[in-house]
């Protein structure tokens, strides 16, 4: 038998600026503990202000 497969406990997410500037952060979050989407107030360097960033899933391109 092979080695057991490890479960993924963290997920990479994309935090997109609510100011619609196109700026985003990539970060990780626990897949097991957090079920709600994140809302964080972070700095958007495009407009030089702190704005809300909303969580989105990262789309993966299939080859």
From Swiss-Prot:
Gene3D superfamilies: Ribosomal protein L33. Signal peptide: none annotated. GO terms for molecular function: structural constituent of ribosome. GO terms for biological process: translation. GO terms for cellular component: large ribosomal subunit; mitochondrion. Keywords: Mitochondrion, Ribonucleoprotein, Ribosomal protein. It comes from the Eukaryota. PANTHER family: 54S RIBOSOMAL PROTEIN L39, MITOCHONDRIAL (PTHR15238), LARGE RIBOSOMAL SUBUNIT PROTEIN BL33M (PTHR15238:SF1). Belongs to the bacterial ribosomal protein bL33 family. This is Large ribosomal subunit protein bL33m. It comes from Dictyostelium discoideum (Social amoeba). The gene is mrpl33.
């Amino acid at each position: 038998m092979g080695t057991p497969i490890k479960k993924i406990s963290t997920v990479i997410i994309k935090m997109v600026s609510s100011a619609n500037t196109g700026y985003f952060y990539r970060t990780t979050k626990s897949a097991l503990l957090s079920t709600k989407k994140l809302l964080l107030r972070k700095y958007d360097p495009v407009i030089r202000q702190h704005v809300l960033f909303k969580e989105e899933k990262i789309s993966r391109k299939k080859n």
